Amino acid sequence: LLHCHDPATGATRTHMFHVPVVALSLTDQPAHLLVALGSGLILFDPDNGVRQDLPAKLAGWPDQRLNDGRSDPRGTFWVGSMANNVATDGTPTPVRDGEGTLYRYRAGGEMTVMETGIGISNTLCWSPDQRHFYFGDTLKNEIRIYPYDNNNGDIGAGTPFFASFERGLPDGSAID
């Protein structure tokens, strides 16, 4: 489900999707959202409900699914995957470690693999000075830090930033 609320009118519209909605981002196209579904990326117009498939389909679907995503300071969309933990009938299945991938999606359809071997992709954010990228693997109970080049959107090798949380697991992040 995707709920769209208009604060000016108080109206809320709900849009149904047949796969999980895992993340979304504004685009440079008026009235269009970039929506990360479990199966891949689409452009979506919430005003009329029109969905446009993008060439960025998840190759491992339905055995893998997208899980979390966010736009970087340049407006490039990053999204991570994991082993699908929901069977086609809706029942839970075990999560398999190491089957997730971190992708960078650029307008025009370029989907680049940035890292592999991830358990559960979660918690993407960038430092305020735009020099570092943080990315979490919930299954490994770890957040990694990567050098980030804001000129081209590339990352360097990641190193552990924080690991082995005693309470809770990394899932969602923000820096202010």
Describe every region a protein language model picked out.
Residues 1, 18-34, 60-76, 83, ...:
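Beta-rich, blade/repeat-based domains predominating
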Residues 1-17, 38-43:
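Beta-propeller domains
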Residues 1-3, 40-42, 94, 100-103, ...:
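A short loop-to-beta-strand structural motif that recurs across blades of beta-propeller domains
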Residues 7, 29-31, 46-47, 103-110:
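Flexible "stalk/tail and boundary" regions
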Residues 10-16, 52-59, 109-116, 158-163:
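A short beta-strand motif characteristic of beta-propeller blades
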Residues 38, 82-84, 138, 148:
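Short loop/turn segments immediately following the C-termini of beta-strands
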Residues 47, 146-154:
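Short loop/turn segments immediately following beta-strands, especially the blade-tip
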Residues 79-97:
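Short, conserved, GDST-rich strand-edge loop motifs in beta-rich repeat architectures
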